[in-house]
Amino acid sequence: VLRWAHENGCPWRVDTCVYAAQNGHLEVLQWARANGCPWDERTCSMAAMAGHLEVLQWARTNGCPWDKRTCFGAACGGHLEVLQWARANGCKWNEETCSGVALGGNLELLQWARANGCEWIWDRCEAEAKANQHENVLAWLHKNKPTEP
């Protein structure tokens, strides 16, 4: 369908690569790129959010840009292996990564992020965990609440 649409004048949009990455369709992404389809940072962030490490790796190897939203996406999706790979390959992160983990509720991922120097805004993490009823994350947060200066 995509090939037919493109061959019949349907213009390329960045979203084509984003949706292919989000849904783990590596062959579609490869075909789209080979035929001139543009991409941007969202291609990597959506692959990460959905846990498609192979797609993310291919995108990066082939020059797709990424930013801190890639780590945030992996965090929200609860994909520790994806987050570890992104960080090992130079992807930036910030306090939003920990907020994303609290939103997604993966305690192991939150512990790994904090142990590896990811900044956080404790109150925001608590609010995300509470809003999404992640009791194990809340318990860990309360045990690890920063002391007031």
Identify the meaning behind each predicted range:
Residues 1-149:
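Ankyrin repeat (ANK) tandem alpha-helical domains that serve as protein-protein interaction scaffolds
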